């Protein structure tokens, strides 16, 4: 009999994110209009699971509030003892008959649902004990390196701070996403030790434990390295925001919409634009905007929850909120209107 919920999803969101140099918890920093952890959670929507567990710690109440509209189970990691310890805290929240656990980090807002679904399918099809997502980076600094044998078989992960010079030259890195058989996972976590430079319990150690116990371990190589970008600085935050904005803009342009300097334009995921419309540089469509066909929105205009009927025109630097622009109507430049 097929199980209804063979998979539990665990998202790690307890850390402080000190490199962000912010009082705001790292996973709550906005990327393309919403906290980055919401993007991670959304990427799991296509997986066969109704159990999404968020490990919280730093600013736990704020993280709970940010995800209040999502069906999540929250587990508190009282002490920050490492990623293995974080996953261990989720044990009681996972049903005993659950077969697999997928573990993600709350600071990877670019991860695609397609990659997660492909990884999970491969994990199940190949009857693997552990499937690890990896990728190749030109500059692998700050990432754990993948150590393989001469045949290319995955052996272990070495964290940056524990890597020797030869290991640091390795370009294949740990993307921080795992799919693990539940029964093996919690046996292995009990064996993880903190004998490393950080004195922490590393989740990465389960790879070495799986190999040594002759479990089936495989990698899923992420096709797009930027998809697994971990946001650890304001620079990476800006990069992630730009990438999601451009993904959205490419999607819109493919429907027959023209854009001037698309890298400067922000179109919310809830907004719709008809074909043969022209969007100027620096335009922002916030909330739920409905733009008809043959519309024109000039440079720097900001529309929030607005409707533009076909053939209408909004002038440069106008700011409209909750407005309806009638067919063929033109709103002059620099107008401020709210309804």
UniProtKB/Swiss-Prot annotation:
Enzyme Commission (EC) number: 2.7.7.23, 2.3.1.157
Sites where the protein binds UDP-N-acetyl-alpha-D-glucosamine: 12-15, 26, 77, 82-83, 144, 159, 174, 232
Protein purpose: Catalyzes the last two sequential reactions in the de novo biosynthetic pathway for UDP-N-acetylglucosamine (UDP-GlcNAc). The C-terminal domain catalyzes the transfer of acetyl group from acetyl coenzyme A to glucosamine-1-phosphate (GlcN-1-P) to produce N-acetylglucosamine-1-phosphate (GlcNAc-1-P), which is converted into UDP-GlcNAc by the transfer of uridine 5-monophosphate (from uridine 5-triphosphate), a reaction catalyzed by the N-terminal domain.
Subunit structure: Homotrimer.
GO molecular function term, any single one: metal ion binding
Binding-site residues, Mg(2+): 107, 232
Catalyzed reaction equations: alpha-D-glucosamine 1-phosphate + acetyl-CoA = N-acetyl-alpha-D-glucosamine 1-phosphate + CoA + H(+); N-acetyl-alpha-D-glucosamine 1-phosphate + UTP + H(+) = UDP-N-acetyl-alpha-D-glucosamine + diphosphate
EC main group: transferase
Coiled-coil stretches: none
Necessary cofactors: Mg(2+)
Keyword Nucleotidyltransferase included in the entry's annotation: yes
Keywords: Acyltransferase, Cell shape, Cell wall biogenesis/degradation, Cytoplasm, Magnesium, Metal-binding, Multifunctional enzyme, Nucleotidyltransferase, Peptidoglycan synthesis, Repeat, Transferase
Region feature Pyrophosphorylase, mapped onto this chain: 1-234
Record bears the keyword Lipid biosynthesis: no
Family recorded in the similarity comment: Belongs to the N-acetylglucosamine-1-phosphate uridyltransferase family.
A GO CC term attached to the entry: cytoplasm
Region (N-acetyltransferase): 256-339
Name of the featured protein: Bifunctional protein GlmU
Gene: glmU
Classification lineage: Bacteria, Pseudomonadati, Thermodesulfobacteriota, Desulfobulbia, Desulfobulbales
Annotated metabolic or biological route of this protein: Nucleotide-sugar biosynthesis; UDP-N-acetyl-alpha-D-glucosamine biosynthesis; N-acetyl-alpha-D-glucosamine 1-phosphate from alpha-D-glucosamine 6-phosphate (route II): step 2/2; Nucleotide-sugar biosynthesis; UDP-N-acetyl-alpha-D-glucosamine biosynthesis; UDP-N-acetyl-alpha-D-glucosamine from N-acetyl-alpha-D-glucosamine 1-phosphate: step 1/1; Bacterial outer membrane biogenesis; LPS lipid A biosynthesis
Cofactor note (record): Binds 1 Mg(2+) ion per subunit.
């Amino acid at each position: 009999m097929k199980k209804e919920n063979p998979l539990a999803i665990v998202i790690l969101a307890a850390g402080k994110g000190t490199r962000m140099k912010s009082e705001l918890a790292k996973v709550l920093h906005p990327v393309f209009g919403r906290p980055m952890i919401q993007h991670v959670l959304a990427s799991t929507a296509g997986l066969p699971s109704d159990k999404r567990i968020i490990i919280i710690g730093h600013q736990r109440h704020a993280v709970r509030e940010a995800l209040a509209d999502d069906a999540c189970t929250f587990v508190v990691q009282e002490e920050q003892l490492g990623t293995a310890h974080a996953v261990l805290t989720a044990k009681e929240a996972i049903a005993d008959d659950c077969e697999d656990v997928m573990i993600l980090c709350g600071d990877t807002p670019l991860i695609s649902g397609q990659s997660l679904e492909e990884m999970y399918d491969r994990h199940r099809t190949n009857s693997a004990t552990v499937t690890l997502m990896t990728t190749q980076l030109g500059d692998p600094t700050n990432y754990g390196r993948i150590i393989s044998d001469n045949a290319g078989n995955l052996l272990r992960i070495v964290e940056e701070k524990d890597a020797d010079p030869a290991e640091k030259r390795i370009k294949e890195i740990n993307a921080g996403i795992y799919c693990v058989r539940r029964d093996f996972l919690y046996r292995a976590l009990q064996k993880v030790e903190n004998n490393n430079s950080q004195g922490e319990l590393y989740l990465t150690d389960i790879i070495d434990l799986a190999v040594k116990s002759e479990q089936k371990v495989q990698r899923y190589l992420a096709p797009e390295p930027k998809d697994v970008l971990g946001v650890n600085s304001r620079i990476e935050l800006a990069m992630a925001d730009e990438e999601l904005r451009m993904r959205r803009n490419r999607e819109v342009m493919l429907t027959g919409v023209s854009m001037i300097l698309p890298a400067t334009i922000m179109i919310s995921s809830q907004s719709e634009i008809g074909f043969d419309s022209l969007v100027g540089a620096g335009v922002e469509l916030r909330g739920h905007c409905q733009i008809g066909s043959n519309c024109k929105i000039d440079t720097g205009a900001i529309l929030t929850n607005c409707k533009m009927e076909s053939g209408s025109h909004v002038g440069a630097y106008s700011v409209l909120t909750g407005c309806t622009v009638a067919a063929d109507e033109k709103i002059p430049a620099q107008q401020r209107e709210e309804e």
